[in-house]
């Protein structure tokens, strides 16, 4: 299957090609057709499997098809952390580069003056963290009457971080007629319970992780004093002459890019690999 199967508008297909992608991932293959049919979706897949593009791409297609001009936001994407919200923003900008789509991000740590300026203009997509979004709503800076799609990204993290009460208040401020999408790395009873509160007859999609064990992997735990100590210890291990290749996992895409740059300048032949590439 190729991305052309989804019959995206040429502008979206062009952005996908420019990003170097040729074939959708399993979560994208199953989620995109359902979202394009305006269905509620509850989807689960491991981190790094293309979950963000699984909802961003069909959302952009639906926005492109809808020519009605409203103040917006027409799409509301809620993420548990500032960093994850910024990653979604990067993805939206990448795939919407050839479309006339307006997006903005409001997260904690940004000045209210800047965010108020962003919200003063018509918006197609708003990406936000729960606390700041609820705060701006209470101030009357944003309304959800035009919101047609609402995405809850990393739902399991939202549960862990105690954001459900905020999400509930935000949801209750909408028309409750919007298409609801919920994406999560895990799909346990607590996530399913929250989904039953916000989603109506959702299509449930679960991509099972590869859990095969490997007996030839040795595991060790090292304690470090700080970030600098961790970096130096990592470089010490990588300098081992018996080591030919290594794979280093980071928590976020930005950390992967930063570590790649640091190791490159320390004379290690290094390359990053993540979902934005």
Task: Indicate residue ranges for each PLM-predicted region.
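Conserved helicase RecA-like core
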Residues: 2-277
């Amino acid at each position: 299957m190729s991305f052309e199967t989804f019959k995206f508008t040429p502008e979206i297909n062009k952005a996908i090609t420019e990003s170097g992608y040729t074939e959708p991932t399993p979560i994208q293959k199953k989620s995109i057709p359902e979202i394009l049919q305006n269905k509620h979706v509850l989807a689960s897949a491991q981190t790094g499997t293309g979950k963000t593009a699984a909802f961003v791409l069909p959302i952009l297609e639906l926005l492109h098809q809808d020519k009605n001009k409203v103040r917006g936001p027409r799409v509301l994407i809620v993420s548990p952390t500032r960093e994850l919200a910024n990653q979604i923003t990067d993805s939206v900008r990448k795939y919407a580069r050839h479309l006339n789509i307006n997006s903005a991000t409001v997260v904690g740590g940004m000045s209210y003056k800047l965010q108020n300026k962003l919200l003063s203009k018509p918006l197609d997509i708003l990406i936000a963290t729960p606390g700041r979004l609820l705060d701006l709503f209470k101030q009357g800076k944003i309304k959800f009457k035009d919101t047609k799609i609402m995405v809850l990204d990393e739902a399991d993290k939202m549960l862990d971080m105690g954001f459900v009460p905020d999400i509930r208040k935000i949801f209750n401020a909408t028309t409750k007629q919007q298409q609801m999408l919920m994406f999560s790395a895990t799909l346990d009873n607590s996530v399913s319970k929250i989904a039953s509160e916000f989603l109506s007859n959702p299509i449930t999609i679960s991509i099972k992780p590869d859990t095969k064990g490997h007996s030839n992997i040795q595991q060790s735990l090292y304690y470090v004093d700080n970030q600098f100590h961790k970096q130096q210890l990592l470089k010490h291990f990588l300098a081992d002459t018996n080591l030919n290749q290594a794979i280093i996992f980071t928590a976020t895409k930005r950390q992967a890019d930063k570590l790649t740059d640091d190791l490159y300048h320390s004379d290690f032949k290094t390359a990053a690999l993540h979902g934005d590439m």
